[in-house]
């Protein structure tokens, strides 16, 4: 009798893993591409609470990687030159966001990490783990 709850929990876990990985199967077959103005706004809006004087910020945009899904979640790394909520981080701040892509377009963004100063290397390392490089932003 005790095996049934464990089996049910294991089966539920396996099924949830299958459904969450389905989005990764609709991967784009095209090359990397530049973000549209609307996509840039989506990402910039998600960074608003992490920077001061956003109207003065200068965004450096990296291309969207070729392996980004047509529908699903992807990671994106780039950088912003702005004042931070934490003054030691003022200046160039690499960031990592998770974006939701629908029909090949970024429709939402959530900040995973942003840091400037000597801690910028932490974000660069996080990006590198996912095959991304915020230093490719222009």
Feature roles, as predicted:
Residues 19-138:
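Cystatin/cathelin-like cysteine-protease inhibitor module
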Residues 1-18:
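Sec-dependent bacterial lipoprotein signal peptides
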